[in-house]
Design a protein with these regions (language model features):
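Glycine- and acidic-residue-biased ligand/ion/polar-headgroup-sensing regions
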Residues: 60-62, 66-71, 76
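Conserved short histidine dyad/triad with adjacent acidic residue
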Residues: 28, 42-58
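Ligand-binding loop in jelly-roll beta-barrel domains
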Residues: 36, 92-118
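Well-ordered beta-strand scaffold positions
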Residues: 45, 70, 78-80
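A short, N-terminal "cap"/entry segment at the start of jelly-roll beta-barrel domains
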Residues: 1-39, 121-124
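Conserved GNAT-family N-acetyltransferase fold
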Residues: 45, 64, 88
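Short acidic-glycine-tyrosine-enriched beta hairpin
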Residues: 77-92
Length: 124
């Protein structure tokens, strides 16, 4: 495991489509992964206009930091309109979803804890 890591341009990191049932227009870039740190990961996620990650839950905690664009998150049974500068923490096993409701890309940094069970349970 390296002592440090520098990414000069996070937009240049390989993008992977979010591969869960019902996800559309969501792309993930792993900035810090298990090879860098066994405790948590840092990801940049880009959600295209109209794109979404459906209602789902997982055993790991997740924090969303909104950098650009606007969206709507469902967390448990509440709905939050998100915009740049906001931070949303989602506890383990808390149902949540995110959708881009704007006309530009929704860009968020997500931090997730690594747990024994990293599976995602889609609820819709």
């Amino acid at each position: 495991m390296p002592n440090y890591k520098v990414i000069n341009d996070i937009t240049s990191v390989k993008q992977e489509p979010l591969n869960i049932r019902g996800a559309t227009g969501v792309y993930t870039q792993w900035l810090v992964d298990k090879g860098d740190n066994p405790k948590y990961a840092v990801r940049r996620q880009v959600i295209k206009p109209g794109g979404k990650a459906p209602l789902h839950k997982h055993a790991y905690a997740e924090t969303f930091i909104v950098l650009r664009g606007v969206g709507k998150m469902t967390v448990d049974k509440g709905v939050i309109e998100i915009k740049p500068g906001m931070c949303v923490f989602v506890s383990p096993n808390m149902p949540h979803s995110i959708v881009n409701i704007g006309s530009e890309d929704l860009e968020v940094i997500t931090v997730i804890s690594y747990e024994e069970d990293m599976s995602i349970n889609v609820l819709e």
